[in-house]
Amino acid sequence: MPSTGLDKKPDSGATDLAALDTHLIAPPGVARRVFEQLRAPAEGAGFEIVRVRFGVQDGQTLQIMAERPDGSMTVEDCAELSRMLSALLDVEDPIPGEYHLEISSAGIDRPLTRPKDFERWSGFEVKVGLSEPLSGRKRFRGILQGVEDDEVLVECDIEGFSEPQVLGLPFRQLSEAKLVMSDDLIRESLKRQGPVNDDPDAPADGE
């Protein structure tokens, strides 16, 4: 599918999306270190880590979003993963001092962090932020059209065009991306996943 080339810089070469698979999952620092330590054990237990965040406001907190390969994540799954990761973190000890561990599903209006997320949820509305402006903008909202080469395709309204345009947003420049809550998204999420913990603020807690 063609995309507009508004204010795009020349590409320095093809980008391997597999190498970009972590920059939205876990930023450099504690979160990235934790992700790299826990990714393989989590996958071995049948889970995929969607996002890792570490914050220090109101005490140190480690937040991990995860799901099964089919996108499902029950309350029981959260509890199981919390027990497993708590034990691993006690051994690896990647965070100095005391901290609070929170395990949750990605929720319905979920963050999109991996190339396959953008393919899986093609056709639904998204909000995307960029680290660098494209055509003078850093934020876009439109209908996700999947991934092509090293770009995420989003159909959105652009000033100067009478019809919505499909923009190619460089994956390496994405700073955030998430689905927009809608009735269609709720129905599709329930259809695909079955019962799901759709409240990321109601995590399974660990020590």
UniProtKB/Swiss-Prot annotation:
What is an annotated GO biological process for this record, any one?
ribosomal small subunit assembly
Task: Note the Gene3D superfamilies from the entry.
Answer: Ribosome maturation factor RimP, C-terminal domain, RimP-like superfamily, N-terminal
**Which key words tag this protein in UniProt?**
Cytoplasm, Ribosome biogenesis
Return the GO cellular component terms, semicolon-separated. Answer: cytosol
Pfam families in UniProt: DUF150_C, RimP_N
Asked if the keyword Cytoplasm belongs to this entry, the reply reads yes
Location within or outside the cell: Cytoplasm
Q: Which SUPFAM superfamilies match?
A: YhbC-like, C-terminal domain, YhbC-like, N-terminal domain
Its family remark reads: Belongs to the RimP family.
Q: What functional role does this protein have?
A: Required for maturation of 30S ribosomal subunits.
Q: What is this protein called?
A: Ribosome maturation factor RimP
State the organism named in the record: Parvibaculum lavamentivorans (strain DS-1 / DSM 13023 / NCIMB 13966)
Origin organism lineage: Bacteria, Pseudomonadati, Pseudomonadota, Alphaproteobacteria, Hyphomicrobiales
